[in-house]
Amino acid sequence: MEYEFRRNSLTGTFLATFSMDHEVLGQWFSEELGPELAKIQQVLDSVTEILAGKRESWQLIGSDLTLEIDREQARVYANVLGFDEEYELEDAMSLYDAESEAYCGLEDFEQALLSWQEFVQKGI
């Protein structure tokens, strides 16, 4: 999993871009997490607790995307994917899940999160 962090010099916004099959992680970092150091630390603390065996799993529901982490992996998915099965869209109308959901190993996610934290701290 490759990623790149940038900051728009005109608007000051922070942007994360992740490799193919992980694009939604970039959206989550950029839009749901953003440059909020307290929120970044909250997620890091939860990852640390899970890796230490103090917690089984953790979830952070955002406005558009949700993060779920457990002992094995991190999953980010669009909240719209959580709709009730009886209301599923027809095949022709189905969502492109590859851009709406991504998984990565928990250690890889932690490393990306630490890199994001460092990037944001330097940019503020």
UniProtKB/Swiss-Prot annotation:
This is UPF0231 protein Sputcn32_0682. It holds the Pfam family UPF0231. The lineage of its organism: Bacteria, Pseudomonadati, Pseudomonadota, Gammaproteobacteria, Alteromonadales. InterPro entries: UPF0231. Belongs to the UPF0231 family. Coiled coil: none annotated.
